[in-house]
Amino acid sequence: MSERHAALTSLPPILPRLIRRFAVVIVLLWLGFTAFVNLAVPQLEVVGKAHSVSMSPSDAASIQAIKRVGQVFGEFDSDNAVTIVLEGDQPLGGDAHRFYSDLMRKLSADTRHVAHIQDFWGDPLTAAGSQSADDRAAYVVVYLVGNNETEAYDSVHAVRHMVDTTPPPHGVKAYVTGPAALNADQAEAGDKSIAKVTAITSMVIAAMLLVIYRSVITAVLVLIMVGIDLGAIRGFIALLADHNIFSLSTFATNLLVLMAIAASTDYAIFMLGRYHESRYAGEDRETAFYTMFHGTAHVILGSGLTIAGAMYCLSFARLPYFETLGAPIAIGMLVAVLAALTLGPAVLTVGSFFKLFDPKRRMNTRRWRRVGTAIVRWPGPVLAATCLVASIGLLALPSYRTTYDLRKFMPASMPSNVGDAAAGRHFSRARLNPEVLLIETDHDMRNPVDMLVLDKVAKNIYHSPGIEQVKAITRPLGTTIKHTSIPFIISMQGVNSSEQMEFMKDRIDDILVQVAAMNTSIETMHRMYALMGEVIDNTVDMDHLTHDMSDITATLRDHLADFEDFFRPIRSYFYWEKHCFDVPLCWSIRSIFDMFDSVDQLSEKLEYLVKDMDILITLLPQMRAQMPPMISAMTTMRDMMLIWHGTLGAFYKQQARNNKDPGAMGRVFDAAQIDDSFYLPQSAFENPDFKRGLKMFLSPDGKAARFVIALEGDPATPEGISRVEPIKREAREAIKGTPLQGAAIYLGGTAATFKDIREGARYDLLIAGVAAISLILIIMMIITRSVVAAVVIVGTVVLSMGASFGLSVLVWQDILGIELYWMVLAMSVILLLAVGSDYNLLLISRLKEEIGAGLNTGIIRAMAGTGGVVTAAGMVFAVTMSLFVFSDLRIIGQIGTTIGLGLLFDTLVVRSFMTPSIAALLGRWFWWPLRVRPRPASQMLRPFAPRRLVRALLLPSGQHPSATGAHE
């Protein structure tokens, strides 16, 4: 140990002296603080459930799209939904439908938890779309109330309770699955795993501490310190979360617990390692305490600030998966650092008073001295060998594949996975997790014109690669509505014509009846023509007789006039007699005179008759002359009717042959389900069934239409995500140049959501990674006071991070055959950035202390002094994080093992070989801009001044320092 170091320890700083003086008080304060925060608020898991935040990125385009669908259709305002699956041993019948109806009534009545039910199976029009091909399963989507995880979980539990308390018929089972149910089960599995993993971790750490220290008391005391740290961190984070300082998530609570255990154990090992080293060097307990504090406090502070700062950089992330990790873990690490710098030294002081922390075995530094000697002797080959080892992991990175399917990372016994497995026996994965496309315009689309455009949109999307099914108003069951193709409409016109052919045949036969009637009429006309000749002859005779009668009547009239003129005076008597009517003779004679007046009238009428007879004799021959043309015309008409009959008969026979099966084309197009010639007439909008379909696929005002799209394969895969942009592109191309051009297009669903998550994760990883690297670099420069050393630390951390993630890919993906979950990359990268610099920092800090002995000697001494401690701490940290593999959430296990592999690589390769070999290769440039001696100064010069100045003072006068060949 150098004199400078001795001088520093001879006058210890005030902080370690205060800690040593008030050690018992500090221990009691920490115990009281831990008890208070754990009694004042519920446990961390309980607070986490009550203050959990939604994992869905609320500002993502896909989430906004789903919410927009719910708004314009007036159905829901959240993105949480579950799927209720009915499965029967036999095809679902009336009992299953009655059970389903009862369940729907219960769900509809619970408006506190249920926002909307997408009841397709309850409507005969769309039932086939929600029923399996074997008729043994059906499903219904239920949208829940709640935009944060706490409300959503309550809604999931309420729906499950209603399903469980509604007795199904024999042979029928009901399951609750879907995204919200899966997230609820994930949180439950994570919370249940914390206690199990913590217990396993405690036992493993206890065993490792026994191996390291060979002392039960030391191991127990370290575990007690770690337990107090863990209790304080858990309680303090729960207290802050309970007061809404920040929100929590399953990942935050799980990672916080193990990070607290691992970091607290690491810091305890750092302190005990340096304390034991000082005791082996012959220092008393108090001096060893100050040496320990001086040698590790800045390392612990730098390590803790690095972890806390790097984790807090996650607060800049947009995804709740990462954002919820930032503040809780950062604050937890600050508490761990505070405990390590106060509680740890206090416990060490109290324990050392009772000689509890004295080393039980001799430290063996020979092996690490040999490693250090080999490194300074062959730094180039050692560095090349470490790079070769790192290349194993780096070469595995290009084969990295990820998945977004949460089901694979949860126990198969979870209710959501059980329900998903039941659904998977009857439905494709994409059918239960469809994409929803919304097209919103500024006018009512309930008309034939816009129906053509909407069908074009559906057709374009359906014919793009990777699409299994598209449901829309023009294809409610995934295929175009039957009888809506133009060929079918034309074919139906042929069917109508065929139905009219029999009527036409009857009318053609009626022509023959008309011909027969015409023949009868012609014959009648011939007879009438002959009879008309006879009538004319008789009429001429009658005319002659009429003339004779008129002459006779005129003569009679004249004679009667003569008679009347003679008897006129007598006649007057008969008209003047008032009582002539009563005298028969008088009245009779008067009547004779009246008869004479009638002869005048008769003569006048006969004259008229003679004139009429003369006219008739003139007209009758003319009338008879018209009959031959009429007979000719009727004969022509008869002949033309016969010709028309023959023509129509031939046409009928030809049509009958051509229209043998007029509906064949329509049936063929219906069977082929070709959607190239869709047309929906205006009359369809009055159809009651179609009106029900409009309510499902068009908004109440008709200005928005939704499409339900099922992808081929699993949408929660990179292949499924790659279909999102083509769907949007096809929709935009379909409405280009149509009345819907300029309409707003929204796309949500499983693949769209994970696409937004993938893009958000890239952004978050970039932002958090750059921020964390910058922060770590600044902290390292402050602590080491060397730009190059800080850059080397950060550079090796980044290299270690890439190699360790590649090793994780190699282990999980290539050896175990399990793809890594999408968030493993981002979380493990940030965590490795945070914890990866600890051991390099401890090594370089020790190297800086020993540099007075020369660069190479300092490397050897630093390796000997820190090798065992850093290896033990790194192994404990790595094993602690790897114990996440016992969690029921395989995601946590993948994150933990990735970090564990990274810490092992960092401890055994980077810190042990790569960093010291780089320091040996760079020499004094490793410490730039600090000025260091490549070789040690003489013992008498070292404490005082630079060699040239001291020699100028001590050497005899006239002897210049340069004459001795001495140099700096």
UniProtKB/Swiss-Prot annotation:
Keywords: Cell membrane, Membrane, Transmembrane, Transmembrane helix, Transport. It comes from the Bacteria. One of its GO terms (cellular component) is plasma membrane. It is found in: Cell membrane. It is a multi-pass membrane protein. InterPro entries: MMPL_dom, MmpL_fam, Mycobact_MmpL. The chain crosses the membrane at residues 22-42, 204-224, 245-265, 297-317, 328-348, 378-398, 763-783, 787-807, 815-835, 866-886, 890-910. Belongs to the resistance-nodulation-cell division (RND) (TC 2.A.6) family. MmpL subfamily. This is Probable transport protein MmpL2. The gene is mmpL2.
